[in-house]
Amino acid sequence: MALETDAKNSNAVAPGDAATVATTKAKENNSSAGKKQQQQQQPNQNQNLVNGNGNAADGPAAKKKGKKNRNKSPPEPAAEPVEASLSNGHAEKTTSEEGGDTAAPDTNANVGEKSEDGGGAAPGSELETEDIDLDALHEVGITVNISSPGADILSVQLSSMELVQEIHQLLMDREETCHRTCFSLQLDNVTLDNFAELKTIEQLEQGSTIRVVEEPYTMREARIHVRHVRDLLKNLDPADAYNGIDCTSLTYLNTITQGDLLDKKKTRPDSVDCTPPEYVTPGVSEPPLLPLHPNIKNAKGPQALKVLTTSAWNPPPGPRKLHGDLMYLYVVTMEDKRFHISACSKGFYINQSTDDTFNPKPDNPSHLSHSLIDLLSHISPSFRRAFQTIQKRRTTRHAFERVATPYQVYQWASPVLEHTVDAIRAEDAFSSKLGYEEHIPGQTRDWNEELQTTRELPRKTLPERLLRERAIFKVHGDFVTAATRGAMAVIDGNVLAINPGEDAKMQMFIWNNIFFSLGFDVRDHYKELGGDAAAFVAPRYDLHGVRVYNAVDVEGLYTLGTVVIDYRGYRVTAQSIIPGILEREQEQSVVYGSIDFGKTVLSHPKYLDLLRQAGKHLKILPHAVLNERDEPVELCSSVECKGIIGNDGRHYILDLLRTFPPDVNFLKLPEVQLSKELVDMGFPIEHRHKLCCLRQELLEAFIEDRYVSFIRIAAVHLQQLNAKKQSEKTEEKALPALEEAEKESSETKEAEAEKPVEKKEEEKQQPSSNETKTAEAMVNAIREAQSNVATSNEVQAAEVVKRACAAVGSLKEKEFDFRFNPDVFSNGIRHVDGEEGTCSSLAKQKVLVQDAAEFLVVKQIPAFIKEHLAHSSPPIDGQSLTESLHSHGINVRYLGKVIKLLAQMPRMDYLHRIAVLELIVRATKHIYYTYMQNTEPLHLSAAISHFLNCLLTTGPVNPAVSSEEAHKKRSNGNKHNKHKSKGNKQQASGNQNGSSAGSSSGGSSSSSDWTLVTPRSLWQQIRREAKSYWDWELDCDSIETAVSKYGILRISLLRAFCLKVGIQVLLREYNFESKHKPTFGDEDIVNVFPVVKHISPRATDAYNFYTTGQAKIQQGMFKEGYELISEALNLLNNVFGAMHQENGSCLRMLARLSYLLGDAQDALAIQQRAVIMSERVNGIDHPSTILEYTHLSLYSFANGHVGMSLKLLYRARYLMVLICGEDHPEVALIDSNISLILHALGEYELSLRFIEHALKLNIKYFGSKAMHVAFSYHLMARTQSCMGDFRSALNNEKETYSIYKSQVGEKHEKTRDSAECLRLLTQQAVLLQRKMNDIYSNGKLTSDLPPIHITPPSMGSVLDMLNTINGILFVQISQKDIVKVRSEIEKHFKANSAENEVNDAIKSIVAAANNNGDTEAETKDATKDNKDLAGASTQLTNGDKDAETAVASS
């Protein structure tokens, strides 16, 4: 959900938010005033235009105030570009109507000016090739005064491109005017059009006064006003966040820091309470659950009313309608007084009705108020006081805490929530509409029309692209919310099927213009592919296809809006509806592709043209198949891909489940012979369905690997071509020699992977010079070869290219061509085989797909493990592990093979444990889904609690159906149980989720199957599932053996499983070791929530700015990188609004850059927002949230908030232990930070406990001679010396010295520092020993020995060490050093340019040899486009790790 709302729609942004954000930002800006210039943003977050078709489209985007500026590269933003003001950046001042004006500071000075050296675009980026019209983003502001009844005059700065509607929203959000909803804005007594831009209003000038005029209510306006009042009163209540309603979510940063960090004063070390909670100290076995949601008792605000609901006297009878009555309300105040309220066109008043008597006349004395808040304040003093308290508490919270998130975030644990009377909640629950759809022209939304219309918006200029992407994002967010609600209604039995007479599994549904289908093989459609198992995974693969075609974004090619929802064990696919598809049979609709898996095949010239364009990017090979009449039919996609021309004339494609080629490692095919290496590893594995496909990331990595080989081989042959008197024999030997060299090189690299990380990092520095020499030699050889080619050796050059193509397996003999035929191994499809050596050769196509699958196992999996050996950004839970696997193109079905490799490496123990936990959770999910389908709604909570007992406990698990449920009469309300008696046996033995019949269902026909499951039987099923699905032997038969053998924490398993399948448990401490009663009871299951999968729309221009900024950072140009990433954040705010995952990534990077540029206060302000955003959009216990907390603790310490820094680290450590346990490299980093700060506070014993644990982990994961270990020894020595234990300190510092000496040599600064530390410690130890000897011999000190000095460290030295631990090193460098660094950078770029020259030379020779370079260039361009398309969102979320690494090393 985007932040924009209709002027009358207040549920997306909490009332008062925008105004509060403005004031919050003002505080933050003042805190860093004088350091940098403040930048105003106009993200235009409240636009919601309605076009002629009734589709929601957004107004003009991204505007800034400042001087006009047109540049190819982005302008230099000022210091606070990250201020994503939700009130559109309005700078406000309040002017008393009686007093004079107070001049507001000029917040727009010098904004938008271009720096002389900054903002250059990276080569090849879109920023370089397009003139970005930043004029549209930097409009000069205009100041207007707003006069509201009963409020001070408000002065607001606006952009001339903003809409009048945004002033509307601003006033509804401000504290003084938030209780008004029904008003118009007038200038010179002329009412302004809500959708007019300010620049189009002729009378509007600088300093003009706009009047707020109260308007008469209509029924719609009255209902909106009542809903708005309810939202105001519930503003502080976390119930909606726990219930997963209205895109609300939790954040606990302010609870932990007890207010805004920016408002706090620096703390003295002696005034800090630094004692860690018991569950945070090292050695905790099972972390408690309650601290996950701190201070929940005080989370709810004061109660203003007992009841606010619509009256049972609604609707007004005819005579009262004629008197202007709109609706009736019923209120019970805190004084226990009961009132019936009438809403009329003039406002609200108390009438004389009672619960039994209808008397609509006004009460005596009558009091009419235009605002319901005013009326309630008049009749109830308690309401007035409570409402003021709510407003005050709301304004103390950070603005980001109240803004709606783009998508709903669900909590896996919830406290007991009080269920209150709420008429609006009741209305929403049983309404067939979705919230505010009735406020949109045309009533019910036409989702398909909206989704397609937004994609058709123009995209030539930056403002047009921003508008288009913003509209796509908004409509997509609304569609996901509607689809999720509809899917839950379908499973809960609240939607009538369009084919109610058929079996429950075969039923389909239409709700709110969305089509819903269940994940079952309804008509044996997938019989040959795996039945229900294939039908269950098909929607997920289809969603992948929709994602990549949307990313390619070919104009004229349309996909359906698609969302996949897992809920209560069922998989539901929600799709938008193609116009006209329900009016005719499918056979009549399809004009391209096949509806029967290749028996009949159709093609269409328009589809061929569109899909050929997309295929260039997706590496899909056009191919021909035979139809039923043995005629060749050309296709540019898989056979299953269907093309349908809708009644709207658009060309739709659907059923994209086979967009990418099959994975032959999981298909047993007679014609496929895998390599011996794969066979030895157990491949091929027969999967339970035949839809296994390779990932797009893998194909890109494979093509890139082959292209690098192609360049190298061509370069070697060109050198040979230029050598004089070269024999034919030498030429024939060159290729095998090269392959042997490459093989040796790969073996060497794999051997090096086992060496300590430090040696690897040292050796990484060395090859740079060798690579430079090699590149230079290649360039020289190619230059000579080119001169020969140009004169007489074109035939020989063509032969070189031909050999290189043959060596890498190119589809074409004389061109580098790698594309894939997705149908190459499909059963029942008859291919048209081409000539040998051409791209239409079926044999070549099959070999290529086999090679890609082999590349995954032989290269990508080892590369994945090697990358994580350095522990630079280690996965923390199953989700981050899965994301990392996917980024390497590795499917999760290879998890068993990954686990086998990890088990052989002790230094990857933590990753092995996380992978085993993820595999157990996924296997259990397969079993749970069938288990849930065989459970009646009456027994859901009992069945779920019984399942959790079987999974997590060893005590008694006898299922006890509660007496309440036992006495309920059985109901057949749920359609999925209508046919249980005759169809249950089939369903019980069926395999909807992909588990084998024997392993995932009891095979019983009774709907009480769930009562038969025991811990032993469940773990046996999990073992069978692990073996059959992942080919991995799970060596445990109970939770105890899993805990003892693999080190899994039960609380971590509970969390992972609840998140995976959508269970919400009660927030309390669970005793998993209980031997007397079950751990979980049915009252512990609070709710079940949907698990939603959908595509994430992109912000392309923001992505380009971001990646260019990353490139600048990696070059050490922090200031320029800061400016570019600030601009990226600005654009993200325009597309996504202020709350989004990618905005959080930008904020984290900007905070780190601010810190490096010396502005710790600015870093603190930005990082605080990053933490809140991560908690809101990712989750309070998400791995990203932990990372944000650790960053914030560093900046807090740098700003003097020592106690807060410790609290933040304690929170981060608790979350880490909850998710994955203490045995993790990141815990070592957190413990080192905690130890240092405790050391600074003089808590030496506590400090020693944490640093000892960090040392133990560092030795385990980095090796005993690693630099991390040396630093840990040094910290221990410092702490022990402060405790007076000089002997131990001396021993530890000796270890430090030994490691530094062996790693960096005796002359290195670190070694010399350690030697000096050793000298001082030795001196102090000798001194102490003399004193001790003197006391022992004489009973007292007799000699005049100097005192022992134990100097506590200064805060500055502690901060320096914290920086070092966290990878930040500030270095003072001389002019001589600058010159040296510059020469090194130039050398680096020279090497890069040499490589580029090699590539360019090869390409030119290829072109010369073929006399046609178009195809090759096109292939390479497509490869580049493919890289740009691949995972742009993932890059934006995770890509900053590389840049942060560069930041750290710089």
Curated annotation (Swiss-Prot):
User: Which spans of this chain does UniProt mark as TPR repeats?
Assistant: 1102-1135, 1228-1261, 1263-1296
Instruction: List where Basic and acidic residues composition bias occurs.
Output: 725-734, 743-765, 1417-1428
Sequence intervals crossing the membrane: none
Q: Write down the SUPFAM superfamilies for this protein, in alphabetical order.
A: Hypothetical protein c14orf129, hspc210, TPR-like
Q: Which GO terms describe its cellular component?
A: cytosol
Bias type Basic residues, positions: 62-71, 968-983
Look up the domain of life of the source: Eukaryota
Give me the stretches of Low complexity compositional bias: 29-60, 984-1008
Q: Which family does it belong to?
A: Belongs to the CLU family.
This chain belongs to which protein, by name? Protein clueless
**Gene coding for it:** clu
